[in-house]
Curated annotation (Swiss-Prot):
CDD domains: SmpB
PROSITE patterns per UniProt: SSRP (PS01317)
Protein name: SsrA-binding protein
Family under the similarity heading: Belongs to the SmpB family.
GO cellular component, one term: cytosol
Keywords associated with the record: Cytoplasm, RNA-binding
InterPro entries hit by this protein: SmpB (IPR023620), SsrA-bd_prot (IPR000037), SsrA-bd_prot_CS (IPR020081)
Tree of life domain: Bacteria
GO molecular-function terms, A-Z: RNA binding
Length: 158
């Protein structure tokens, strides 16, 4: 089987992009079991309840992410919601740890994807949005969509 190249998106966390203002993005590797990778190849995963924590030893963990059991797996299948270790350079972890010490900042998982056959997680240092900010962002998005629709309609008439 030829080696896989390029990137293939598995799952996105749309809720994170809505609830948080993204500051810095990072790419992290994931320490997974074989059945987890097979389940991800089938596109089965959810990041809606996922969050990232840093323990006392300075290791980052992806928690709350749901990777369902592999359908063809046997007794050695993985636990769907287990903690999964994120693989980053020590300096990146230190920078993120300093970032979340500031009030209102957190680390959120944005997406999971395959890159050259390996599972990667896109994570971000983010600041929580207030309800007003969320409504304003939605309004701006709708206005932009309506403007595009109006321009498209005007171009069709000529």
């Amino acid at each position: 089987m030829p080696k896989e190249t390029g990137e293939k998106l598995i799952v996105q966390n749309k809720k994170a992009r809505h609830d948080y203002a993204i500051e810095d993005k990072y790419e992290a590797g994931l320490a997974l079991t074989g059945t987890e990778v097979k389940s991800l190849r089938e596109g089965r995963a959810s990041l809606s309840e996922a969050f990232i924590s840093i323990d006392r030893r300075g290791e980052m963990w992806l928690e709350g992410a749901n990777i369902p059991e592999y359908l063809n797996g046997t007794w050695n299948n993985h636990a769907p919601k287990r903690k999964r270790k994120l693989l980053l350079h020590r300096l990146q972890i230190t920078k993120l740890a300093r970032g979340i010490e500031a009030k209102g900042y957190t680390i959120v998982p944005l997406s999971l994807y395959f890159k050259d056959g390996r599972v990667k997680a896109e994570i971000a240092l983010a600041r929580g949005k207030k309800e007003f900010d969320k409504r304003q962002a939605l309004r701006e998005e709708q206005d932009k969509r309506e403007a595009l629709r109006a321009m498209r309609y005007a171009n069709m008439r000529h």
